[in-house]
């Protein structure tokens, strides 16, 4: 799987991509069971990105790896993940299997995120960005951090922090809209 050479890494592959690939190889050389991948393919060209994602998936199967894959690119998340957690201002607002989350998002922030992902089957659709300014993570709003931008916000959302609760087996959301009336 790996080979070592006296050639310095910068001569094998140039720039950021080469050094990132060498870092990945070094991380795998110790045969980990768990690997944190923070924006692991963000700086890569789309064609290289696809190859690296396929490599990640192959290695997951061959080496029985578990990844914590952190990414802002939802198409990458959908492609590589079995489960997804969506965060807003440092708090998990939804957790579900990848298939469930992308098919039927529950939390208003997750819905807004997925609504902004361009899709071929919705080419003629007008995309409306989430309204309002993103609050500062250093001084987040009271209550639900998403309430200033949420179209469903109530006074309860402004005053109380919703807890991440199971809404179905293997699925959790932090939203007061899930409470039964």
Language model segments and positions:
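Single conserved hydrophobic/aromatic residue that forms the stacking wall/gate
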Residues: 1-18, 23
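A generic local structural motif
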Residues: 7-10, 54-56, 131, 160-162
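Conserved Q-loop
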Residues: 15, 77-79, 143
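Conserved ABC ATPase nucleotide-binding domain "signature" region
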Residues: 19-20, 50, 135
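Short catalytic/signature loops enriched in Gly
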Residues: 97-181
